[in-house]
């Protein structure tokens, strides 16, 4: 009888717990400086654009573009925010905000938060992700990892 109750308990637990899976996105792109406000020799505000491509571990790929602002004080990037648009097949879109604080900038690690998404991928909305980024001249490579429900792209 104990086994029967254990099986029933496990069934209900598995029914109510949403399974989580890793959603990994790799982004490649080119950075272009649009405008700089140079306040002093060590302080400035830069506006950048990014155009590139992405692919994920679910077989999706597409184009991405970003609007970025970067605040530098005493030659140290104090704040960096990137507003990103991901364009999938069939006019599916996702938008996220990538942030990095001054502590995160040295390590090249930050956070993504998906803010707006098409209905086809609605489970991605409000997903928080960790990303890392590497630069080479005006190009970059970013990889993010998100924990999302298994139904997010089904």
Predicted segments with their positions:
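Beta-strand-enriched cores of mature, soluble protein domains
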Residues: 19-154
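Sec-dependent N-terminal signal peptides
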Residues: 4-13
């Amino acid at each position: 009888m104990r086994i029967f109750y254990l099986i029933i308990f496990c069934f209900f637990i598995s029914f109510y717990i949403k399974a989580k899976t890793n959603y990994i996105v790799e982004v490649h792109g080119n950075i272009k400086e649009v405008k700089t406000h140079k306040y002093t020799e060590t302080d400035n505000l830069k506006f950048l654009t990014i155009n590139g491509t992405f692919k994920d571990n679910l077989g999706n790929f597409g184009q991405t573009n970003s609007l970025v602002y970067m605040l530098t004080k005493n030659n140290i990037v104090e704040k960096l925010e990137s507003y990103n648009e991901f364009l999938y097949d069939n006019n599916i879109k996702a938008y996220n905000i990538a942030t990095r604080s001054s502590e995160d900038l040295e390590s090249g690690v930050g956070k993504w938060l998906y803010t707006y998404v098409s209905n086809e991928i609605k489970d991605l909305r409000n997903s928080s992700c960790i990303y890392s980024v590497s630069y080479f001249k005006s190009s970059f490579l970013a990889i993010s990892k998100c924990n999302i429900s298994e139904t997010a792209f089904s």
